[in-house]
Amino acid sequence: MICNRLWGDQTESSLKFFNISTEKMPWELIKALAQIKRVSAQVNYDLKLLDYERSQAIIAAVDEILSGNHKNEFPLSVWQTGSGTQSNMNMNEVLANRANELLRKNQINIVVHPNDHVNKSQSSNDVFPSAMHIAAVVNLKTKLIPVIKLLQKTFLKKSIEFRNIIKIGRTHLQDAIPLTLGQEISGWDFMLKNNTNHIQSTILDLSALALGGTAVGTGFSAHVEYAERVVLGLSKLIHHSFFSAPNKFESLSTCDAIVYSHGTLKGLAISMMKIANDIRLLSSGPQCGLGELIIPANEPGSSIMPGKVNPTQCESMTMSCCQVMGNDLSISLGGSSGQLQLNTYRPLIIYNFLQSIRLLTDSIKNFHDYCIVGIRPKFKRIEKLLNKSLMLVTALSSHIGYDKSAQIAQTAYLNGITLKAASIQSGYVTEKQFDDWVCPENMIYPDM
């Protein structure tokens, strides 16, 4: 023990030689390491590789950590050895020293060693990638996916609520034919359904654990039954069906499952960027922009312009999305840079992966609670813009042809007159025909 801390020499050495920046190993990863150590202690006892007293002392020490104690005992920087060995040893040292305290308290005169006992049947090279997968699965399932579904459910509700509000569509940021506000929002709803499916599809590969592969994937120094038993124990502890990776050489030498999974997080960030930017455009103005949506006025928008309401939730959301997209590049570079039997960019990769989950989870929750729930349509503005649009001329095209319809639209635009006036003036259409044919209500569904 060093200076009344539970860590030991290897942790202290890492603090000295890797005193870099402020990014620490994420607690989610620390927790996953602890869970592996807990189950390993039990499995090693069951396989008669570890005595009862030591195994129970290790388990008791782990349970203290899983209860939220001893967080200050894990101080290491992300910018350490690329295998995560120093964080694995940090965990081994803390558990060994705490287990020894518990044994002494119970007057049991034996010693728990960080390598010989806590790390038995393991290597940092199979423990750390397994902890990465565990942390990824748990945080995707319990944090990110639920908030995506929450937002998607609200979009579905809004799409039904606004299904009868007809508005002008826009392509290339130019006026297009009509659709309903509900139809527009239904696109956002379906984007999130797709994102959820894509993210969930990666959980199977993340459920493969490298444990039992030890140093290079051969399993040397691990009991032949260790891998299957430890995976079964982790599945019970975490309430998720993990399985032993079928090829340990792949699972040690690559981070492909994490790289692929983060690609779906980047996909979610892309979708959220589009949705947030759409809302910024639709709420712009409000008097001199599109102004079709009213967003909640959560806080003063300007220190100089009274009464200004800014789309701050959209801005926060899109900044988070930018960071996630940047994280994806870092993860891709790290994933592609492993050599031979081991990827040595793992701390970088899992730090960015878990940051992306936190950013998306928190941003989507805020975006939902403080923006989407309170969005309202500005009915008069929507109606005014719909009736002004020259693209309603598209309804005439099937009756008088494309060229004549285009001529009418150009005449209306150049002379500053209504589409109806230009149509009657052209002589191609009577007033009654215009009223019968140019009807936005009939332009929001396929032709019968």
Curated annotation (Swiss-Prot):
It catalyses: (S)-malate = fumarate + H2O. Keywords: Cytoplasm, Lyase, Tricarboxylic acid cycle. The active site is at H172 (proton donor/acceptor), S302. Pathway: Carbohydrate metabolism; tricarboxylic acid cycle; (S)-malate from fumarate: step 1/1. The keyword Chloroplast does not apply. Substrate binds at residues 83-85, 113-116, 123-125, 171, 303, 308-310. Its main location: cytoplasm. The record marks E315 as: Important for catalytic activity. Its EC number is 4.2.1.2. GO terms for molecular function: fumarate hydratase activity. The keyword Lyase applies. Gene3D superfamilies: Fumarase/aspartase (C-terminal domain), Fumarase/aspartase (Central domain), Fumarase/aspartase (N-terminal domain). Involved in the TCA cycle. Catalyzes the stereospecific interconversion of fumarate to L-malate. PANTHER family: ASPARTATEAMMONIA/ARGININOSUCCINATE/ADENYLOSUCCINATE LYASE (PTHR11444), FUMARATE HYDRATASE, MITOCHONDRIAL (PTHR11444:SF1). HAMAP family: FumaraseC. Homotetramer. This is Fumarate hydratase class II. It comes from Blochmanniella floridana. The lineage of its organism: Bacteria, Pseudomonadati, Pseudomonadota, Gammaproteobacteria, Enterobacterales.
